[in-house]
Amino acid sequence: MEFSKLSAPTLKELFIEQLENLILSGKLSIGEKLPSERELADSMQVSRSVVNAGLAEIADKGFLEILPRSGTYVADYRKKGKLDTLVSIMKFNGGTLPDADILSILQIRKVLTVLALELAIPRITDDEIKQLFNCSAKLDEENESVNAAELVFEFDHLLCIFSGNTLLPLIFYSFKAPNTTLFERFFRLYGYDAMRKRTEAICIAIRSRDFASAKNIIVNSIDETISGSTKIYR
């Protein structure tokens, strides 16, 4: 096994993590005004430049609202957040997501993947179909959950690319972190056979230009992870 290089977090990263944890834990409530940058720097023993850069990044994620000549306030991240916010929530929960967020991700994935199939099947080339089969074959040989999760994501992302819609691959890719986390969880709970069969069956349906069958495979597969025999949240 090859081990990766370890690196210590920067002061800014530590500052961001601590403040986000205070917000996500509820110790800092929505609407609460933060101390001044100078007070934060003094109490946390960091420079004002670290505080300033950290607050800007946290605000960009939707956790804070910085009002000129007024101060910095805790924002409702459910209303103002974005994908980076979701990654912070995952880190706070030890790499997992609340059940409501898992359900939401699965629902979004179903909508995006079905749209990708609908757009891709009428225009997909033989070479693109070959790429999908190659990705499916790699999954058949993979027995490590992290790598297998990457392959499943790659397969679905290829579908988005082959759809011809210029925005669909970008939107789908923005959900990579939570999606691969859920795939890893799926493989740890249920093994690899179900996802291998699903991926190969989609390839066969696409090769036959059979959108109805491909859609049925995707929808049934995701519905099973929501409320069926391969459910991946409580």
Language-model-detected regions and their locations in the chain:
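Short acidic-aromatic low-complexity motifs
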Residues: I206-R209
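A broad structural signal for alpha-helix termini and local helix breaks/kinks
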Residues: M44, S163-G164, Y233
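Solvent-exposed, non-membrane alpha-helical residues enriched in polar/charged side chains
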Residues: E20, L24-S25, C160, C203, ...
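Short linear motifs at protein or domain termini
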Residues: M1-I108
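C-terminal effector-binding regulatory domain of bacterial HTH transcription factors
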Residues: M1-E2, F211-R234
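A short secondary-structure junction motif
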Residues: L22, G26, G81, T166, ...
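Conserved amphipathic alpha-helical segments that form helical-bundle/coiled-coil interaction surfaces
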Residues: I105-E184, M195-T199, S213-E224
